[in-house]
Amino acid sequence: LQQLGVDVIYLNPVFVSPSNHKYDCQDYDHIDPHIGKIVEDCDGLLSPGDRDNSHAAKYICRVTDKRNLEASNKLFQELVEEIHRRGMRVILDGVFNHCGSFNKWMDRERIYENQEGYEKGAYVSADSPYRSFFCFKDQNLWPYNPSYEGWWTHDTLPKLNYEESEELCKTILEVGKKWVSPPYNVDGWRLDVAADLGHSNEFNHRFWKEFRKVVREANPEAVILAEHYGNPESWLLGDEWDTVMNYDAFMEPVTWFLTGMEKHSDEYREDLYGNSEAFIGAMKHHMRSLHMGALYGAMNELSNHDHSRFLTRTNHRVGRLSYAGAEAASANINPAIMREAVVIQMTWPGAPTVYYGDEAGVCGFTDPDNRRTYPWGKEDLEMLDFHKRMICIHKAYPLLSKGSLEFLWNDYQGLSYGRFSDDEQIIVILNNQEYERDVHVTAWKTGVSRKGAAAFQRIMISSKDGYTEEAEEYIAEAGILQVRMPAYGVMVLYHGAKDKYK
């Protein structure tokens, strides 16, 4: 990761959980020993056909034994220290809208019921200290009351009942504080389905204001970013979230334009494929919802744990693992389109965020196929090298982090935009067609004079035949750049102090 050029590592949930995705938290206070450290173990796997998890002795030992939990927290502490030593930062995933049915507060699986040192869960007993943490529809079903509210009716994801429990609010605020404080010292939180927390918009805002206050008092530099679909303006007023995962003003417009695919690979739309007018319109509309600080810090992703891999979307195949099969996700993919997307990602306003494996050519339909293991020893080395080079360009030119944005040219399957300041310009040109063509770009919109000639240096070009950083000069005459663009091509040009960034 350090060699790739990563500055921040955002970890999907790492707390105790029975699943591989871990968005069904079992214990917010401890790192899962299965990805941490197991120092005490025992026999006792479930027998074939046995669905009673209270019989899973081996699992119960691993996730309830304090020695395993403490050792795992210690290992995580050491990991964060090493990440910081290498000049990188760490963001944790906070799943606070709901927990899992395995959670010690609920204990539907009766894992904690007979374990020393644990209170009875709210599912198990009406006298549980955690009863108010959840909303039970029928008060007459204890012991083992299954009538609790589930997020989107999922009984494996009990929704947390904040409005009725001051103790729950206090507990989650302590969790938020704990992990950004010594000895763990993480650098911020990504908040899962943040707008869903609570049962009213009013309470939701009140809680996140308090969360921000507690977290920032513990760590003034901690970032707070949220998963959110739709307009986030009311949460971005400076007292709740810092920014968001940028679906509306990045992932969706980019994937529709370059691939015509919906981000789960559930739909193909010919009317949006290559439609640069729709791309520009969507970007302008949704970027207005983000103030400058939120926009420049927004997580610009091509793929993530909830959606299909971008490289898979380049095959224009509607499908899911359940009926299309894993091999279909990598059939007829187009790495050149992936490189176009990576260039946009690394030159667009915001924080480019690479989902593990995208840089190595990993394919996959939506969850769970998008969570394949990293292909150690089988990486697409060309894609990996391209990511390294584009990350290097992103970090080398401050324009790409702070510069203004202007659209310069567009047509069907074609787009150009500029990032610029008073004395420097970067121009990106894309041709998403399967054949080469000439384009004329209005470079003057970035501040280049229309009265003479301006020399732009090419710093990256990619096409269906590969890519290169080999320098080549392009002259803008009277503020117009004329460029021959290759098939499935993208070019990055720079004008300014010629040797400034060497």
Language-model-derived ranges and their functions:
Residues 4-9, 84-91, 184-189, 219-223, ...:
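Loop/turn elements at helix/coil->beta-strand transitions in domains of secreted/extracellular proteins
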